[in-house]
């Protein structure tokens, strides 16, 4: 008996009582044969205003062509996106994290309302990645991700530069390290075309995580946006989704607990973004896999950092593709017993089977260190707790900035206040910069603090100050930084009670973050604290404040 592959779409296309549905589909130039084909949603996060996303509509057309060669019906649709790089440092960043959930909601909505049988999702930027994955997990229909791909490095006066070079150029100009002319040249040459920000920033981090999970094709996370290989990946979409339909392999068959452990190992080895903690937790929730921040610490305790990628290192993701790409790194880890090779993937094969014929990394490569010569012996993503963060926080400590920092609090109630302080020389060596009321509810939307960290690095203070916040950090942030402090200031967390001059210790060896205050002093400050007014009184951010939970 022939297997039914259009088990969802036939609800509309083969039911005589759905004549109006069929009339509208005929109106889209579908014919009689098309009515019996499985319908594949091709969900792109295309829009023109961002290098990460501007080419995705073209990739979606390549995918549609591939799907229809397999006697399937491709149905392209779009969802929204927010460019963190463009909105960074402005109130627009409040919309970034909530865009992840809007993307997931909108893909789920279109797929469910139109009864599509499978999904090929094409994200390009930071929050696109988990948003698409959350939708796939909720729907649990055959589907996978095609990453839009990484950007090529920019070149200025013979040296490679990227988006973080552009972010840091303002601080460098303020401190006299570069001229205004050099700053202008930097920002014009940092982004040479289509593709996601090139270092191990959030989009590339999540692309690695998705490939390690088995939810994208091998090499998807390391091929460049404008490469022939990316087009070839799109050309494989039809046979891949048809195979998933025929084998009835669904996201929840792939996104298992062991697969998430693979993802956590890979992003640790790669030196990935702190945002991976938030996003992997949300992705796991979408498929009912029990994952907590403590699981990240367990992985960090036994997993080294091996990759020398920007922002703290030398290389961009395009450099990795030239020496074998993400699969070559995973093959090394599999050989070392650090990955679960028996996990199923969207190829219909196991992870180990996918990696069987992948070439080893070149012995003399300088991008991925050997296991016996790590950049850091344990993971860079450290979960810190203490009286500053009783419910936890996420630190990004590569080891290059040290592992313990003691200093005095320099407190700011917004990102803007801190930026103004740097501009006027009010941030000094030995400061623990505190930026608060930037959490999920207080921000709102938990904006990323890339502008402050870039100013710090650009001003040459990267080794001399620490920054803690109830907001987030971009994958482009580096230095001695601790984010996701919970409870957040808006809800009366300890970070709301800190004052200028308080002595703060950040210890990434023992995983603690404490302020030197007695319980009596803390209780006294707490009694005087009053909740601040919501920053959003209408619209989507008001809804977000009402529904979002603690980081």
From Swiss-Prot:
Mg(2+) binds at residues 84, 126-127, 448. Its cofactor is [2Fe-2S] cluster; Mg(2+). Gene3D superfamilies: IlvD/EDD C-terminal domain-like (3.50.30.80). Transmembrane segments: none annotated. It comes from the Bacteria. GO terms for molecular function: 2 iron, 2 sulfur cluster binding; dihydroxy-acid dehydratase activity; magnesium ion binding. Coiled coil: none annotated. Pfam families: ILV_EDD_C, ILVD_EDD_N. Its EC number is 4.2.1.9. Belongs to the IlvD/Edd family. NCBIfam families: ilvD, PRK00911.1. Homodimer. Functions in the biosynthesis of branched-chain amino acids. Catalyzes the dehydration of (2R,3R)-2,3-dihydroxy-3-methylpentanoate (2,3-dihydroxy-3-methylvalerate) into 2-oxo-3-methylpentanoate (2-oxo-3-methylvalerate) and of (2R)-2,3-dihydroxy-3-methylbutanoate (2,3-dihydroxyisovalerate) into 2-oxo-3-methylbutanoate (2-oxoisovalerate), the penultimate precursor to L-isoleucine and L-valine, respectively. HAMAP family: IlvD. PANTHER family: DIHYDROXY-ACID DEHYDRATASE DAD (PTHR21000), DIHYDROXY-ACID DEHYDRATASE, MITOCHONDRIAL (PTHR21000:SF5). This is Dihydroxy-acid dehydratase.
């Amino acid at each position: 008996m022939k297997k039914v592959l259009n088990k969802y779409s036939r609800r509309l296309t083969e039911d005589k009582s759905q004549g109006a549905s069929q009339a509208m589909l005929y109106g889209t130039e579908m014919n009689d044969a098309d009515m019996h084909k499985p319908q594949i949603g091709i969900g792109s996060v295309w829009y023109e205003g961002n290098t990460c996303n501007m080419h995705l509509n073209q990739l979606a057309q390549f995918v549609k062509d591939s799907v229809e060669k397999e006697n399937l019906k491709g149905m392209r649709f779009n969802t929204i996106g927010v460019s963190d790089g463009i909105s960074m440092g402005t109130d627009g960043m409040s919309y970034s994290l909530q865009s992840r959930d809007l993307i997931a909601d909108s893909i789920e909505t279109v797929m469910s309302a139109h009864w599509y049988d499978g999904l090929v999702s094409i994200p390009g930027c930071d929050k696109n990645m988990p948003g698409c994955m959350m939708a796939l997990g909720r729907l649990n229909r055959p589907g996978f991700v095609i990453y839009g791909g990484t950007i090529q490095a920019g070149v200025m006066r013979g040296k490679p530069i990227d988006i973080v070079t552009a972010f840091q150029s303002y601080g460098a100009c303020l401190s006299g390290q570069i001229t205004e002319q050099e700053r202008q040249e930097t920002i014009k040459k940092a982004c040479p075309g289509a593709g996601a920000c090139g270092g191990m920033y959030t989009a590339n981090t999540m692309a690695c995580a998705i490939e390690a999970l088995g939810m994208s094709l091998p090499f998807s996370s390391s091929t460049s946006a404008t490469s022939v290989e990316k087009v070839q990946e799109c050309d494989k979409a039809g046979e891949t989704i048809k195979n998933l339909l025929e084998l009835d392999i669904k996201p929840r068959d792939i996104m298992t607990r062991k697969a998430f452990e693979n993802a956590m190992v890979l992003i640790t080895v790669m030196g990935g973004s702190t945002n991976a903690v938030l996003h992997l937790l949300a992705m796991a929730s979408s498929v009912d896999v029990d994952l907590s921040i403590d699981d990240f610490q367990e992985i960090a305790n036994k997993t080294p950092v091996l990759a020398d990628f920007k922002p703290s290192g030398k290389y961009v993701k395009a450099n990795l593709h030239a020496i074998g790409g993400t699969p070559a790194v995973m093959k090394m880890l599999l050989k070392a017993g650090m990955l679960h090779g028996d996990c199923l993937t969207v190829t219909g094969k196991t992870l180990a089977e996918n990696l069987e014929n992948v070439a080893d990394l070149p012995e003399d490569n300088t991008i991925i260190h050997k296991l016996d010569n790590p950049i850091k012996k344990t993971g860079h993503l450290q979960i810190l707790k203490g009286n500053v963060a009783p419910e936890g926080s996420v630190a990004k400590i590569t080891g290059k900035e040290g592992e313990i920092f003691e200093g005095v609090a320099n407190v700011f109630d917004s990102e803007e206040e801190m930026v103004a302080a740097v501009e006027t020389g009010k941030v000094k060596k030995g400061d623990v910069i505190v930026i608060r009321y930037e959490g999920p509810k207080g921000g709102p939307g938990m904006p990323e603090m890339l502008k402050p960290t870039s100013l710090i690095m650009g001003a040459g203070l990267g080794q001399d100050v620490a920054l803690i916040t109830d907001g987030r950090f971009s994958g482009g942030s580096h230095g001695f930084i601790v984010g996701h402090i919970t409870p957040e200031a808006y809800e009366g967390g300890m970070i709301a009670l800190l004052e200028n001059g308080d002595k703060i210790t950040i210890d990434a060896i023992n995983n603690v973050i404490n302020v030197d205050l007695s319980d009596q002093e803390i209780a006294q400050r707490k009694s005087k604290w009053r909740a601040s007014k919501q920053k959003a009184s209408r619209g989507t951010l008001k809804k977000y404040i009402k529904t979002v939970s603690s980081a």
